[in-house]
A protein has these predicted regions:
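The serine-hydrolase catalytic nucleophile loop
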Residues: 16-27
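Conserved alpha/beta-hydrolase
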Residues: 27-49
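Catalytic histidine neighborhood in serine/cysteine hydrolases
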Residues: 38, 219-220, 224-241
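Alpha/beta-hydrolase-fold enzymes
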Residues: 87-91, 95-175
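Active-site nucleophile elbow and catalytic-triad environment of alpha/beta-hydrolase enzymes
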Residues: 177-195
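Short beta-strand/loop motif that positions the catalytic acidic residue
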Residues: 199, 205-207, 211
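Conserved alpha/beta-hydrolase "acid-adjacent" motif
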Residues: 212-218
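Catalytic active-site module of serine/aspartate enzymes centered on a nucleophile-bearing elbow/loop
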Residues: 231, 236-283
Length: 283
């Protein structure tokens, strides 16, 4: 059995302008499997002020600085992220390899990657976003989150609705996203897509068949060209927010397997993970 102390740290990056609360429901299982996990909070990306635009290059630079400050050459890590966070994880991994930086990246996990915005819930009006980009309106237009909020489970979805009724921020992130953030996320994915072929470490992709934001067909199109270094797992019981939805337990176990945690591992003390009211409600 592998010594748990030798396992890489799983470094998780949340989705666009959200927070580590997106991982609250998978944290308990990761801890029970003996996985050392931490969350990367990125200035200008984590709970970003939508009135102060930042670019994807700013996000990547800030994330790189956070890695440099936290992890040294003797600390192997696996980078993972949800939605846009997955693209940041892949970009970081290629950056670390290209620049001979001190971290030892052992793998990348992309959860619900948005290689293309082509999910079933998106109407033809989504194409108008490009007009907003072209006219320079991205700074003033916001997009309201709406049902199903990336969640198939009706009980959890109702809880998120109540969170949004009380606040502009919920377990899945802010109630509105600025158009400039969406534009920068698309630019980030355009940067990452060609880099995946040269990704120097194993890639795990977890994606829901019924993802309403990005179709599984689009994800399959990109991962199928990567060969044996990439593994795509299609989840059958969730929408986009797979760390919160019905498949959250499988997501946690797949991540634990990916970092090499023994299946019969006993939990060890870890830094306290964020606990949302949703996590307390579902537990």
């Amino acid at each position: 059995m592998q010594d748990q102390s030798s396992l890489p740290t799983l470094v998780l990056i949340h989705g666009l302008f959200s927070s580590p609360l997106e991982f609250a429901l998978v944290s308990q299982i990761l801890r029970s499997r003996g996985v050392r996990f931490e969350f990367l909070e990125i200035p200008g990306y984590t709970l970003a002020d939508r009135r102060r635009p930042t670019s994807w290059r700013d996000w990547l630079q800030a994330a790189s600085a956070a890695l440099d400050a936290r992890y040294g050459p003797d600390e192997p890590i696996v980078l993972g992220g949800l939605c846009v966070g997955g693209a940041l994880a892949a970009a970081l991994a290629t950056s670390v390899a290209a620049q001979a930086r001190p971290q030892r990246v052992c793998g990348v996990a992309m959860l619900s990657p948005t290689f293309e915005y082509d999910g079933w819930s998106l109407t033809p009006w989504r194409h108008l976003r490009r007009l907003g980009y072209a006219l320079g309106l991205s700074r003033w237009i916001t997009i309201r989150e709406r049902e199903p909020f990336g969640i198939k489970n009706p009980k959890i979805r109702k809880w998120v609705v109540r969170e949004f009724e009380a606040s502009d921020l919920s377990s899945i992130g802010p109630s509105r996203l600025p158009l400039w953030g969406l534009r920068e996320s698309e630019r980030l994915h355009a940067h990452v897509r060609p880099l995946l072929r040269a990704l120097p470490v194993p890639l795990l992709v977890l994606h829901a068949r019924e993802d309403e934001i990005a179709s599984v067909a689009g994800v399959e199109r990109w991962t199928s060209a990567l060969g044996s270094s990439a593994r795509l797992i299609v989840l059958e019981h969730s929408y986009h927010m797979i760390t919160i939805d019905n498949d959250r337990q499988r997501v946690a176990h797949e991540l634990a397997d990916f970092v090499g945690a023994p299946k019969n591992a006993r939990g060890v003390p870890r830094p306290v993970a964020p606990v949302s009211k949703l996590a307390q409600h579902v537990a």
